[in-house]
């Protein structure tokens, strides 16, 4: 992979300082073990490395071969990257003999270079092959999936992952369109969707929700998010931080519900004769919910929908922290 080609697509890391600040890399924690589950173009990872102590370590993940090529430019013995999904966190840690980490950062969604590179097939704004895979070395492309999937399944994906109210009409149009000719380009799909959607949302292309839905499905984004949240929690040391940046409501809902399930423990009836020490205890503490500043949104409009949630693992009652 040509690194110069990687760098031609500019990317601004969203909530850069805020996310790394949330990991609390100070004092003894600076020499801890950290995970960047989504290396991307390395904005968060590079800032984490700047703040890590001499004995600190950072393990990053990414499915995108361009991201892996970019990571190869980092010459730092404290850094390693895995070319795989962050959902393989437990396996990667076990292979390295690591039981606990002090912080996990997940910057979800799709990066600007992926969107802006027409050859990746993520965007309807420029014509390109209908691919949409984060990892182009494995799995099936969006074009391959649309060529064979049932109308009912296509509708379900667009409705659930795109929250698209015209999912029925769009799926029907896709199946009718592929009967005439294979749907192999982003422009073809965008035009089919535009013809099927009779009304318009102000400031939003009619293909936006459909492209989001198919991308999420092809890359199993929500399923992998649920896996990594549980794996991250399991490996967090006491007072370890989980920092997650989401870019749409489906992701944020999963993150919010997961953190709430660990922080808000149902309590039994107070009238029952249960000792305080035997009451269910919260496993995490909610630290923050942060949105980008007006200044950041002005400089980078793609940050507008970002939401960052931070939670900290609590020590087990009675255990040394």
From Swiss-Prot:
Binding site for S-adenosyl-L-methionine: 42-44, 62, 86, 107, 114
GO annotation terms (biological process): rRNA base methylation
GO cellular component entries: cytoplasm
Keywords recorded for this protein, A-Z: Cytoplasm, Methyltransferase, rRNA processing, S-adenosyl-L-methionine, Transferase
InterPro entries with a match to the protein in the record: RsmH, SAM-dep_MeTrfase_MraW_recog, SAM-dependent_MTases_sf
Record-annotated disulphide pairs: none
Location of the protein in the cell: Cytoplasm
UniProt-listed Enzyme Commission number(s): 2.1.1.199
Record flagged with keyword Lipoprotein: no
Reaction(s) catalysed by this chain's protein: cytidine(1402) in 16S rRNA + S-adenosyl-L-methionine = N(4)-methylcytidine(1402) in 16S rRNA + S-adenosyl-L-homocysteine + H(+)
MF (Gene Ontology): rRNA (cytosine-N4-)-methyltransferase activity
Keyword Nucleus: no
Record Pfam families: Methyltransf_5 (PF01795)
Source species, domain of life: Bacteria
Family matches, as Gene3D superfamilies: Putative methyltransferase TM0872, insert domain, Vaccinia Virus protein VP39
HAMAP family: 16SrRNA_methyltr_H
Similarity comment: Belongs to the methyltransferase superfamily. RsmH family.
Functional description taken from the UniProt entry: Specifically methylates the N4 position of cytidine in position 1402 (C1402) of 16S rRNA.
Name by which UniProt lists this protein: Ribosomal RNA small subunit methyltransferase H
Provenance organism: Herminiimonas arsenicoxydans
Encoding gene, per UniProt annotation: rsmH
